[in-house]
Amino acid sequence: MFKDRKEAGERLGRALENYRHCDGIVLAVPRGGIEVGHYVARHLDLPMSVIIVRKLPFPDNPEAGFGAVAEDDSTYFHEKIYDWVPFHKIQDVIERQKDEVKRRAKIFRSGSALPDIAGKTVIVVDD
């Protein structure tokens, strides 16, 4: 599909040309999304920041996920998960991933808060 993340970001930037110089921001999801987002933001002449989200992996199959958590502590998953996985295991997974989100936010943004996105066009980039 793409030779590398640089090419992906440059092509995505061109595809989003209508957003050049808008009142917007590129939010990149680590790790690979940072490189792609860099080239998108550069092409569109927009600021870029990093947003941390984490998959909620099934306790017995960490490659598969049943939801996600974000930096604002929002958690998204289908309630049917309780039919398959005990409540305490789900809560353990959620707490571990929330801790990891906080740890990564400190690393990737050096402790800085997410930028204010109210009223802005937000372009979320992942690889």
Which role fits each region the language model picked out?
Residues M1-D126:
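PRPP-associated nucleotide enzymes
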